[in-house]
């Protein structure tokens, strides 16, 4: 497994690779959201059913516009999400119809976050698009908190580890339904 900086890993992602990278609270697994084969590989590594869907992280809301159907949201709903970003808040928003089922699962929505973590932001800026994000762990197990554990648990399963430190969050992000305002998972 390659160990790279956030600026060096772009070609790995562009070629369909799956990476591990530090986020606000835990290590994440990620790939190109427009590459179904990469998403399938990520789901296989994590042993996660496609039906559950995945999260997209971005450095700006503009990067999420190709995926989110903003026409189904009110200005107040968008303003609320923007008031929490960048930061540890994931919003479930209506998804555009062309977005792969492998990414959105069996839902008519997609979970999105504008991250405040500098490495996540660098990754998304270097790709000029969001990154698929899911916690680096096998389904049902605790998320990975150290690069050493990534190297042990995912050595021959992923293509690269992005070097860097986790953020200061103690818990994964809070998840909020953008349409209803309902908190689906408390984080922080």
Curated annotation (Swiss-Prot):
**An example Gene Ontology molecular-function term:** double-stranded RNA binding
Specify the YrdC-like domain's residue ranges: 3-188
Q: Which UniProt keywords apply?
A: ATP-binding, Cytoplasm, Nucleotide-binding, Nucleotidyltransferase, Transferase, tRNA processing
Give the organism the record lists.
Answer: Shewanella denitrificans (strain OS217 / ATCC BAA-1090 / DSM 15013)
Lipid biosynthesis in keyword set: no
One of the GO biological process terms: regulation of translational fidelity
Question: Which reactions is this enzyme annotated as catalysing?
Answer: L-threonine + hydrogencarbonate + ATP = L-threonylcarbamoyladenylate + diphosphate + H2O
Question: Which residues belong to the signal peptide in this entry?
Answer: none
Looking up PROSITE patterns in the UniProt record yields: YRDC (PS51163)
Q: Which Pfam families match?
A: Sua5_yciO_yrdC
Per its database record, what is this protein's job?
Required for the formation of a threonylcarbamoyl group on adenosine at position 37 (t(6)A37) in tRNAs that read codons beginning with adenine. Catalyzes the conversion of L-threonine, HCO(3)(-)/CO(2) and ATP to give threonylcarbamoyl-AMP (TC-AMP) as the acyladenylate intermediate, with the release of diphosphate.
Q: What is this protein called?
A: Threonylcarbamoyl-AMP synthase
Q: Give the Gene3D superfamilies listed for this entry.
A: DHBP synthase (3.90.870.10)
Localisation: Cytoplasm
EC number(s) for this protein? 2.7.7.87
Q: What lineage is this protein's organism placed in?
A: Bacteria, Pseudomonadati, Pseudomonadota, Gammaproteobacteria, Alteromonadales
GO annotations of cellular component type: cytoplasm
């Amino acid at each position: 497994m390659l160990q790279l900086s956030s600026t060096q890993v772009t070609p790995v992602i562009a070629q369909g690779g799956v990476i591990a990278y530090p986020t606000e609270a835990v290590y994440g697994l990620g790939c190109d959201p427009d590459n179904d084969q990469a998403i399938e590989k990520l789901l296989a590594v994590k042993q996660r059913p496609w039906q559950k869907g995945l999260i997209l992280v971005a450095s700006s809301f503009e990067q999420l516009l190709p995926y989110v159907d903003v026409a189904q949201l009110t200005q107040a709903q968008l303003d609320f999400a923007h008031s929490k970003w960048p930061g540890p808040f994931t919003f479930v928003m209506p998804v555009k119809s062309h977005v792969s089922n492998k990414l959105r699962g069996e839902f008519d929505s997609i979970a999105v976050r504008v991250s405040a973590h500098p490495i996540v932001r660098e990754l998304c800026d270097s790709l000029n698009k969001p990154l698929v994000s899911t916690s680096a762990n096998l389904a049902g197990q605790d998320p990975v908190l150290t690069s050493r554990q990534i190297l042990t648990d995912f050595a021959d399963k992923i293509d690269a580890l992005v070097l860097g430190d986790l953020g200061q969050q103690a818990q994964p992000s809070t998840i909020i339904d953008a349409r209803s305002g309902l908190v689906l998972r408390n984080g922080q």
